Amino acid sequence: MIIVLVLASTLVLLAALLLFAARRSRRKTGIPSGEIFYQDLVGQPLEAKVLRSSRWGISGKPDCLIRTPDGVVPVELKKSKRPPARGGVYPNHMIQNLAYCALVEDQMQMQVPYGLVIYAGEQVRRVEYNEVNRLWLRKVIAEVRVARTLPRVTRNHQMPGRCSGCGLRQQCDQSLAKS
């Protein structure tokens, strides 16, 4: 009987320590506490569906959505271990995250205070979902629509690695990726 009590007490203490460590880690990294209610990660139990917005004319699947007291926070996980210096976010990652903010706000009718981009080195970067960024998102969406009507779009970078990861590299006559 004493062994069972000691074992139970040890397990309760261990659980409390793990919970404390998890909360401390979340606070340290900038990940908000809240309920993860949507995941588009391989092998995860929560179902992720494509979010669509006819108002914005976009669709997508964020990696994760966290319900917090302030609203829903879209989270995007990136493989890159080297985010921009001084707390920045790459512009393409920022636009993607802003699009997820707009999708959640429009389709789910939920408040979205900000989004997060988490780089592989576990560096969490916050993307403010404010009026300035909404206007930028609207402008980028309009530019993409125009570009999609053009017979040819010119590559806008000199990065072979970016071409290697592109879904259109097989059809692209400007690809820097080695075949």
Regions found by a protein language model. Name each.
Residues 1-33:
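N-terminal signal-anchor transmembrane alpha helix of single-pass membrane proteins
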Residues 34-55:
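A short acidic/basic microdomain associated with nuclease active sites
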Residues 58-86, 96-102:
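Conserved catalytic cores of phosphodiester-cleaving nucleases, focusing on short active-site segments
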